[in-house]
Amino acid sequence: MARKFFGTDGIRGRTNSGVMTAEIAMKVGQAAGTYFQRGTHRHRVVIGKDTRLSGYMMESAMTAGFTSVGMDVVLLGPMPTPAVAMLTRSMRADLGVMISASHNPFEDNGIKLFGPDGYKLSDEAELTIESMLLQELPLADAAQVGRARRIEDARGRYIHAVKASLPDNVRLDGLRIVVDCANGAAYHVTPSALWELGAEVIAIGVEPNGKNINAGVGSTHLDAIKAKVRETRADIGIALDGDADRLIVVDEKCQTVDGDQIMALIGTQLAARGELRGGGVVATVMSNLGLERHLNAHGLTLERTAVGDRYVLERMRSGGFNVGGEQSGHMILTDHATTGDGTVAALQVLAALVSSGKPASELLHLFDPVPQLLKNVRFTGGKPLEAKSVKEAIAEAEARLAGKGRLVIRPSGTEPLIRVMAEGDDADEVEAVVDQICDAVRKAA
């Protein structure tokens, strides 16, 4: 069955158009609420959101949907995606909902669903809910309509949980940390957690107004945090995205440390302590060949999946791995969380920094990345990858890189983009290959 609503990371789109309307949000609430009503207990859903203006509308619409089919609603307000997953489990809820479009601009929004175990739903569950969206579902009797309430201590519960990912004797005293919360969901909790652990915290991206989430700040816009690290002579910078499930680090020299380097650090450190499970790390086809070579040199493997943290997590669960992620900064550490958690990952990096006594620039660049280039080509309709000219360009590029590099071409799961990535030891050849394919896609789009 083809997906109409759910993409690679839930439902996402431009507010008040397509799949992202209040009407559809209410129907998602009704469908998901009906799907998860099992047993005779009073059913409950936990709803969190980021700081987008449309979050109010979507939260209200989903609350109406859930309560109309007899499910009680617990409203968390602005909270990171991993906090929703954690609180879904700890509150014994039947499901969790995060209203967010992650790193996208404020005009977009999205819906992510978590099961009672705190994990994102399976493809099968999402497809079943999709089919229910198109049906007229039975509503609750008047006496069985659900109630909605807000809980006031959600922030404190999450802060306690992320601090518990570190041993009790680990403190961050003496570290000057710049944290950029992207004017998003972590604007309160992450600076608070770092401060409680003893760090000197300089926070930016902590003044959300509904329209400035990810706007020139956060893990996809690093100029702001680099400038602040330089200005304050900070030891390290921690950049999160709008829903705080991804992390990019900036060292004291304002050099970028991406998800591949973070996975290399956490993976090898856990392996040295005998705590790494699965014999390696799980990442996607977009992770740099340098990461694979680094892990192999330490007797570890790199398992690759399709792009999307859900696929990384599926492989981690099936193979018994406890470290996985994406180059873009999704870090999944299943010893501590059931989904990507930028704050938990940041604490592991900071703990390593404290114990090593080294500056971040020495600790966090464990391998030299192979030259890699990623370009996005926007298209307005059709399927450009099926064009004969594009297929021929791809075949020619693969022949040029054979044995010397990798080529990954894929449509975005959330935007009308074709992503073209190549890597290899020859940077000029990598650039030529990417440009060749991008030109072919543009002409076919």
UniProtKB/Swiss-Prot annotation:
The modification Phosphoserine is found at residue 102. Its cofactor is Mg(2+). It comes from the Bacteria. It catalyses: alpha-D-glucosamine 1-phosphate = D-glucosamine 6-phosphate. Mg(2+) binds at residues 102, 241, 243, 245. InterPro entries: A-D-PHexomutase_a/b/a-I, A-D-PHexomutase_a/b/a-I/II/III, A-D-PHexomutase_a/b/a-II, A-D-PHexomutase_a/b/a-III, A-D-PHexomutase_C, A-D-PHexomutase_C_sf, A-D-PHexomutase_CS, Alpha-D-phosphohexomutase_SF. Activated by phosphorylation. GO terms for cellular component: cytosol. One of its GO terms (biological process) is UDP-N-acetylglucosamine biosynthetic process. Its EC number is 5.4.2.10. The active site is at 102 (phosphoserine intermediate). Keywords: Isomerase, Magnesium, Metal-binding, Phosphoprotein. Binds 1 Mg(2+) ion per subunit. One of its GO terms (molecular function) is phosphoglucosamine mutase activity. It holds the Pfam family PGM_PMM_II. Belongs to the phosphohexose mutase family. Catalyzes the conversion of glucosamine-6-phosphate to glucosamine-1-phosphate. PANTHER family: PHOSPHOGLUCOMUTASE (ALPHA-D-GLUCOSE-1,6-BISPHOSPHATE-DEPENDENT), PHOSPHOHEXOSE MUTASE. This is Phosphoglucosamine mutase. It comes from Novosphingobium aromaticivorans (strain ATCC 700278 / DSM 12444 / CCUG 56034 / CIP 105152 / NBRC 16084 / F199).
